[in-house]
Amino acid sequence: MLESEYRYDTQLLIERTDTDLDEDEIHDYLMNEIPGDCLIAVGDEDLIKIHYHTNTPWKVLEYCSSLGDIYDVVVENMERQEHGLKG
């Protein structure tokens, strides 16, 4: 059984394009606007690493891509992984 009620492990990097990135602002937005848990948002004004468990990874990607360039995107289905399948 999953430890989290959220199915998708969503990970990515956001690179600043025009405006400085603020990890606290990003953290607060994700926690308040996109249901999930196990959020990590760390970095500096140029680059932020996101790790978040959610059922709506597309919303995380949409928000993060509005802040800068996103890359190294990984979305894994933890439910499948729990059953020994590729996530």
Describe the residue ranges of each PLM region:
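N-terminal loops that bind phosphate or other acidic moieties
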Residues: 1-87
